């Protein structure tokens, strides 16, 4: 409903009535006069180029402008600079490109430092003694002594007759049972970890994109078309080259223990491998138990008479004989001349070696070997998948200063931000400007930088031990045992006739005999001559600086000096750097809207001069958060970020559990029997004594000293390698290692180039300033624009530094079961004869904990004169080095 005011019935100037509703649009009136030119506001900051949105529909026509007076077209004051808009959401994640070419394998790393020699294990307990052999048969009685002599008084006891000759040796007794195997020694500690190998070579870079197209000319703006349907997705771009793996992140906490793996099927035994090179000579192992009695070998040719055996046990005393007549004690005869030494008997041929004995007890663990060469570096792993969501955008950055408006040019690439110019002088305050429009919400800031790496986590608790594995299959039966221990020597038999000399026997094996008694100390040598005078000594070391003396007492305070003249004013100081910008204060409360003023008469003034630009209006209050805008086009891929600092060395993992014992090796071949020692010369028979009555049983004589050992024979050739034993069941799978840390977030790429600025349209007629309308409802977001074609893949960035070595994985669970022992190998051929001995006794020196040399004990050679020389067994040979 319209209301009218009749001015004819009122006096005075006409008063404005209330504003009526909007009428229908009338025909366009004549062009009005231009209004006064407004102040030119500062140019706004160029905004980020947005994505091309769909063309909007045409809005409804606005109300017609009120006819104004004839004036020049005015120019409204430019509004204040709007706040920066929100950054668009991240585009959809592109498809991952195929894996790049495989990098070449890295060069093999250097050998690690040799590990510390492990301590020698404790020797096993000795086996039980063998059963005693059967007693030898008593030899035949000696010939009776000559009778005669004067009859002595009754009841007297005759002198003891000469001892009968020794009977023949008895047959050897049965071998005693084998002693139990000694307990295995403790394993040596693990060697030091080798240094990591060199990093592999970087992969080949990807193929570069095509050449850049020529710059197109700027076309004339065409008319706006209707909104087209979204086009189909463009063809998928070529995948980019595989990037180098990023540096390793901070070590993550150890993951939970994995489930116990299923037991794998038993593997098939492998074929016999090629014969390996002879290993280094190890330390002598512990004595094995006595083996079972072997099958009797073929009887060899009669050998020469052996050395005199140990004295047998005396027989039980016989019944006392009848007392004989007392004989006359004859004078002792002079000792006869020494007999000539008989020809040495030729040693008989060695018998065939018996069947190999059963495997002996497990020897002590050998000295820990040097760690082998490090294998070649493994292939580079594929880059891990990105773990974790994209972080929220960081706070908004500070807006830069507004730039001046330039001429319209071709859209160029966005340049790097320039350095800030010096601060200009403060201008004169301009006239107060109009209230600025409400500012738009500020743009979201760039994402914050990557946080510092967290503290290294504590190592997790050790997992519980797994269940014991299933019992392994029963091993194959062992081979036949070796020859049993020889029985005790029987009584000495009568001397046999000298046999026919046999053919020369093969050189026997060198066996170390027992240590002979130490010789007596020789007489002291003559005194030496006086030596020449010694050379002049070196100058003594420089003396140390003495301690500083005690601090002296402070002297008395002096009198105060006269006051000096007052100084003049100094030169003015240099202009300081401008201080940092203060914090923006909180926005003040919005003022209350004043009542609308009366509409004044339309003025018709002359065009005034352009006034000074007014100060920038205060920033409006923050508006409501808008709905998310349409998804922008995907920006260019950012350059590769700088390589992160290499991570710190992770804590060493726990020591792994002890591995399963290896299978027993095939038993060694028994060496050839050494030659018997040379028979001693037979003494002359003494004069037969008188036949006396049997005397009391004499005490057992002391055993004679052992003769010198024969020269050691050359060792036999090593036997052929037996077939490898069946491989043991596969051990249970250890728990999975901890998951690696996620890589650092990528650096945000640079913004796309700014679009060309459109031509400024002509200013319309200035209408009356209406009342401020209510805030309209927020429009719905437009449809999403079509993604542009994917650009060519950029070249690969430089390879990042190699990350530190990861920590050791968690130890595996139970040990695998031990496989059965392989069958013994065939006996090897007899070795060639060895060189003659050097006159040294081979002595084994026990281990010493604190020895002056790294060998900590070993073997010594002792010469007949009592001196000792250390014998070092050179690896891979039987040479002996004397020290």
UniProtKB/Swiss-Prot annotation:
Renumbered residue ranges of the record's region Disordered: 1-883
Skewed-composition ranges (Low complexity): 34-57, 113-122, 129-140, 195-205, 214-223, 230-248, 310-326, 390-402, 425-444, 512-542, 574-584, 717-726, 742-756, 792-812
Pfam family, one: Collagen
Organism field: Epinephelus costae (Goldblotch grouper)
Biased composition annotated in UniProt, kind: Gly residues: 147-161, 185-194, 285-297, 415-424, 445-454, 478-487, 564-573
Domain of life of the source: Eukaryota
Family: Belongs to the fibrillar collagen family.
Gene3D superfamilies: 6-Phosphogluconate Dehydrogenase, domain 3
Name of this protein: Collagen, type I, alpha 1b
Compositionally biased tracts (Pro residues): 13-33, 821-836
Biased composition (Basic and acidic residues): 757-771
InterPro entries per UniProt: Collagen, Collagen_Structural_Proteins
